[in-house]
């Protein structure tokens, strides 16, 4: 989890010390309620650094965790802070001309970010999907969603369709909604 800018910078520093010529991207994870509240400040401290923006090629992925914040604050409060953070980071990225992609660490239950992908993406703040999103499905739901080929195809189509609808702001006829 990420609490300070140094949590991110130290990983890059270790890669440089190891003389890794192709730096692996480092994705900050904001999951606890305190981390969600402090994330805008953390990312501001990083984005203010011109060499950091250059190092990441003006592309930043940020992971939003669901489980710990729901445990800390309850589902409603956690959801509000996750929503608010995405709005703040969208504005911050725009200010610094950073291409921002949100990475959602979803569990199976609604308290862990689970639920229908269509509803999840419709509920994201405007301008935070932009045709790009990363989502993990936790171990307990992988078999349920992808263990049988027709289900895997259905779920993949649901993800692709939901991102497309969210990005283009299209409204699908009811017969096509899942």
Language-model features: locations:
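Conserved small/polar residues in nucleotide/adenosyl-binding loops
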Residues: 168-174
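Structured, charged N-terminal subsegments at the starts of enzyme catalytic cores
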Residues: 1-27
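Catalytic or ion-translocation cores adjacent to nucleophile or general acid/base/metal-coordination motifs
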Residues: 18-167
């Amino acid at each position: 989890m990420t609490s300070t800018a140094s949590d991110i910078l130290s990983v890059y520093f270790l890669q440089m010390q190891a003389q890794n010529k192709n730096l692996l991207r480092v994705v900050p994870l904001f999951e606890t309620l305190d981390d969600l509240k402090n994330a805008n400040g953390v990312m501001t401290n990083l984005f203010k650094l011109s060499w950091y923006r250059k190092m990441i090629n003006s592309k930043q992925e940020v992971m939003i965790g669901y489980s710990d914040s729901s445990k800390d604050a309850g589902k409603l409060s956690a959801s509000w802070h996750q929503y608010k953070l995405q709005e703040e980071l969208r504005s911050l990225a725009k200010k610094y001309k950073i291409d921002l992609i949100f990475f959602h660490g979803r569990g199976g239950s609604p308290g862990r970010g689970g639920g229908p992908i269509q509803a999840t993406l419709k509920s994201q703040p405007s301008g935070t999907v932009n045709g790009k999103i990363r989502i993990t499905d936790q171990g307990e739901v992988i078999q349920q969603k992808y263990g049988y080929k027709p289900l895997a195809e259905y779920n993949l189509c649901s993800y692709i369709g939901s991102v497309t609808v969210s990005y283009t702001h299209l409204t699908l006829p009811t017969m096509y909604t899942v």
